[in-house]
Amino acid sequence: MSLWSSVKFAQRYAQLPKVFYRLVTPQPLDNSRWVIWNGELAQGFALPKHADDPQLLSVFSGAEPFSAFKPLAMKYAGHQFGVYNPDLGDGRGLLLGEMQNQQGQWFDIHLKGAGLTPFSRMGDGRAVLRSTIREYLCSEAMAALGIETTRALGMTVSDTPVYREQVEQGACLIRLAQTHIRFGHFEHFFYTEQYDELRLLADNVIEWYMPECTAHDKPYLAMFEQVVARTATMIAQWQAVGFAHGVMNTDNMSILGQTFDYGPFGFLDDYEPGYICNHSDYQGRYAFDQQPRVALWNLSALAHALSPLVERDDLELALAQYEPTLGKVFSQLMRQKLGLLSQQEGDSELFNAMFTLLAENHTDYTRFFRTLSQLDSEGAQTVIDLFIDRDAARGWLSRYLERVALEQTASGEAKSAQQRCEQMRAVNPKYILRNYLAQQAIDKAQQGDFSEVHTLAKLLKNPYDEQAEMEAYAHLPPEWGKKMVISCSS
């Protein structure tokens, strides 16, 4: 039986007019070999669990032409740090084609680091080992956290030198996503006044990903309303888990509200609302607490690009749903994290007091929620000890426990402390991809040892489980590992 006999492939984007993309032959790296293969994900597409067959490597590294693929570089534009840039496109990644999973969903196959394209501008079309490791680990960690995201099927390393601040090893990521269509695709056709192509793009987004919009009397408006709702939900998830993306340009915003293009990202260590993870973000435009505002700005930019298809008043009404949706989803997530099942008056004040307390005491965000979810077994003092101002912590904890008791009285369903805490542990991760953990894996990998990449990948598949033998990975970061800022260079 052929390696590919059970895999279903398609090339829908390649059927669009040539103005949407350029066909490009991948430029394979020298002596490519696997760093890691995501066997569990692969099986969902009828691919083997283990990457033993050499054809897997040669096809997915771009070294061997494959009849089911039609490699292409997408053309798009975008606002970068608020400034429109018309000269964007896939500069080092190629859309190879699509695969269908066992649930019948189609996923793009994208090879990141595949070489020069017509859109490479001053770049070399390559990706380096460190950034590829970070994207592989984080996209899979986010999926395990239940956050909408692209996925990583595998990654390779090579002997090809790549020149950045220093000479580094070239690597490739095999990224899967339900789509690689970005806000910037629509911006490109709008600003170049290619309105027929703009309409065709919207038609295909609806046909491929949002067929329910066709029943709407204004299908393009229905599409935009979905983008608004999905984006608001994604941002609420980011804020709840403490994830900072770092470079929320419109060309990095997925039309399906999926976390896209992992670059200088970071998870909060100490709760610092103004946390900036991208060292190129001098003004803090993409700081953690600015992400909700920036997402709305980006949606407004998309709305402008859709103005030939949708009435302005309709676009404004759709945009007006962003903040209520974000607030509703975020409040739901916060209640889940605190073990509160019902909505009560005063919840916002309780949340705000908690965030103020966390910020003033520089308390670790993930550790706080995980410790709070162990209140049944560890007791209140373990929570209080996380804070410098223990009296303030004691006061907030008293308010919190009163709120828990109020909910039980109001609902008439008194959950035990153990039941509540078990539910909290299912939504408050013990393990996240802290930047220092990723850096330790990168340091080893650059010496040819990929064991830590595999260890983290396995650990982060089950972030809510105790995994007692992995306890060291739940420790607070060392001083050198706190507030790391990451370069966009990759």
UniProtKB/Swiss-Prot annotation:
Residue positions binding ATP: 89, 91-92, 112, 124-125, 175, 182, 261
Gene: ydiU
EC number of the protein: 2.7.7.-, 2.7.7.108
Obligatory cofactor(s): Mg(2+); Mn(2+)
Protein name, per record: Protein nucleotidyltransferase YdiU
Reaction catalyzed: L-seryl-[protein] + ATP = 3-O-(5'-adenylyl)-L-seryl-[protein] + diphosphate; L-threonyl-[protein] + ATP = 3-O-(5'-adenylyl)-L-threonyl-[protein] + diphosphate; L-tyrosyl-[protein] + ATP = O-(5'-adenylyl)-L-tyrosyl-[protein] + diphosphate; L-histidyl-[protein] + UTP = N(tele)-(5'-uridylyl)-L-histidyl-[protein] + diphosphate
Entry similarity comment: Belongs to the SELO family.
Binding site for Mg(2+): 252, 261
